[in-house]
Amino acid sequence: DYGLFTGALAGYLEKVGAVSTKDPDRDRLIVKSLLTGEANWIIFPEGRMVKNKKIVEKGQFMISWAGGKHPPHTGAATLAIRTEFYRRRLRRLAEEKPDEVEYLMDLFQIESLEPVINRHTYIVPVNLTYYPIRARENILSNLASRLVDNLPDRALEELMTEGSMLISGVDIDIRFGDPILIGECLECTIIESDIRAERRINFDDPVASKSAMRKEALKLMQLYMTDIYNMTTVNLDHLFASMLRFLRVKQIDEGDLRRRVFLAATRIQQHAGLHLHSSLKEDPIHLLTDDRFGIADDFITIALEKGNLQKVNDRLIKDQATFTSAYDFHRARIDNPLDVIANAVEPLTQLQRTV
């Protein structure tokens, strides 16, 4: 996030290898390091961190953020395709056009050609699921506020959320999908023609195959987006939040809510296609008895604090508006964490049908 590249924090981020999203040389640097294999890159496929986790609308990937809605960006796919384009171009022209190869090696600061042309480019889908998600002030957010003048609200929110995860303790489930080899998408005639073209092609020069590569990037994006969100690790917060969102009655007894989540949990355990948090792999009978892990109590406490629920005469009154009203995108995880939690499992059709 370019908003973090200010003051003392900017120097630190540059030293550890982070690149601002507004760095004019960003794409060439990424392609160069992918060609040489000196670095791998972590890229948000949505184009930015989706704090509200709202990435599906009417069955299609659609990102909702402070500026409106848009399909997921194809940045990761485009960079992977551009990398493999130049790798194949170097391989193809190594003997036929040595002067062009020399130019490209200089452009990308490549010292040795052999390792570059013998590598391949992959996209590895990765999913990180945090449990529980609770945003609050912490030592990291306080420190950043002192180091950076006028720290942007969105950066502060990220530090409050991620900082709390690191300091207070949180389970992080990391899942890696099958690597996607970038290669087949470059085999159409028009792209092949540009790869073997003998004319000089500078990094930002327009090429005839630009439209074809754009289409391939869109297909590639759909592939890894599906893989990423299908790897979400389902936890009890997801079930409670989804159950509360879809609850058709306006009020409910706490015991009834817990029984519904218990039933959903036992059914979810039978779905082989879902990834479950360790707590969901065990018998959830505690939801019906003493709630000895405090999971139901903690969820309901948060729901009451954030206004999703009100408690009247031992009954829980649901405020449906908290699941449908617009809210500040950059404060989503602070102001409405339950909506964020429910959004995170929206792409999982098996779970949605069960709930």
Language model features with spans:
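Membrane-interfacial terminal anchoring regions of lipid-handling membrane enzymes
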Residues: 1-355
